[in-house]
């Protein structure tokens, strides 16, 4: 499977962001990508005020554009994340569309980004956003794919659930900042890939030093051995990477971590999503 990560610039203009999204998907399709990923909050600035201002319900203008884009370009589209309004609540939501434009999955960010780092970043998503209540996977002709969003990647339990439920690739739209990115971005993605012996893909917005929230960027793909297979820099880029799902089974056969778990001593309890 050929994977395309759209490390696109994000502006305060929704019209510009919509147009940029379509250009990146068009270019990814022209390059032969089967599955295309957008970054976290690609349609608006990363701020609580913007989340509230740009929020749309499922079926709104942005959702329809994503659906139509997946169908037009005949690709699987993991549509980054957008602020989704549902009644009085706003969620950080990733929609997934198949090549026919049908919505195949929807992940609402489970762990909200509430941090206060001494001498660094302070941000509280919970001032505006509500947390999701489910883990998310979907089937493709290539393999099973899990979805998480940004801060979710810090929670090993969620990723172990995705692996136990069959994920061979876990896609993470994310926007680490200039405090957390240099310290933890690559480390976390390599760790989650190694922990679960599957592919991890992190898709971030391009870096804009003039923005109120500066993305670390550096979109990347890690393989089941925990190696960085491909990585972007800070500038806008379409990162393309071939994913060989057979590597997942090969690595798990060599070092059978999932099979070797001592469930007589410890267990990860969770409710299976239907």
Short names for language-model regions:
Residues 79-80, 93-96, 136-138, 219-221, ...:
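Short beta-strand scaffold segments in enzyme catalytic cores
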Residues 7-13:
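Short polar catalytic/cofactor-binding loops
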Residues 16-26, 154-160:
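Short, acidic/polar
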Residues 58-78, 144, 153-239:
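CN hydrolase (nitrilase-like) catalytic-core segments centered on the catalytic cysteine
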Residues 14-15, 23-106, 115, 176-196:
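Cys-nucleophile CN-hydrolase/nitrilase-fold catalytic domain and related Cys-dependent amidase chemistry
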Residues 246-274:
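A short C-terminal boundary segment appended to hydrolase-like catalytic domains
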Residues 1-4:
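Extreme N-terminal starter segment of soluble prokaryotic enzymes
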